[in-house]
Amino acid sequence: MRGSSPRMTSPAKLIDLRHMPLHLDTQADLEQAIHALVKQDPRLKPIFEVAGMPALRRREPGFAGLAAIVSGQQLSTASAAAIWARVSAAFDPFDHDSLRRARADRLGRLGLSAAKIKTLKGVAHELAAGRLNFDVLANEDADAAHHTLTSLHGIGPWTADVYLLFCLGHGDAWPAGDLAVQEAVKIGLGLKTRPTAKQMAPLAEPWRPLRGAAAHLWWGYYRAMKKREGVIGGQEKANSVLNKLPVAKRSSAKAKITG
């Protein structure tokens, strides 16, 4: 647990979240946050009863983590894994400087599209110039960090939120554009239509500063409902990056989770 957060209000009651994790570094952090959310917002109790306690998902932070997410955008799980395996193995070490210096045609032969090459080289140049610092990013609040990432060429809201949540473990990152979370919220809150990314922002306000934990809960609900009811089996699949993220052990040990 890296810090504490200010008090947060909800329409029903005042919940003291001073001891809640700002970052979800361990399974214990996530469990503490989920229990606080369920207590704070009674609407989440039936969601938790269906989903159960979700497992913390983390992956490597820094340039490698962001590069893996970008490489896997809009691809099947198998294709994304194969391309990332080739890209990461082609450089020793794999870092922003190595990729920045690599020829575009070499990267293309590894399976990266021209758009993804441009995005990754752009990020690498920002890091080399000192205009982007992942250590600083890790300590910014979720909205500020999201803005920093989406100001980079080719980094959209979904990519930024997934990086903040799974690579940095940011407890308040909210993937408003994720289709699975949108569909789960629609079903769980009894909405008539699936909310848009813009509509998801106010829906998540009661869950600040633990929106990242809420996202874990909604993903768990999505998986449970899809398996149990089949009601969302025909919906678009969430980005394949999520499907291959390592799952933290269910132990309540205090050791940090490594991606």
What are these regions (language model features)?
Residues R59-Q74:
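Alpha-helical scaffold segments that form or flank carboxylate-/histidine-based iron centers
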Residues V87-G259:
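Catalytic cores of DNA base-excision repair glycosylases
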Residues E31, P61-G65, R101, D143-H146:
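Alpha-helical scaffolds flanking conserved acidic
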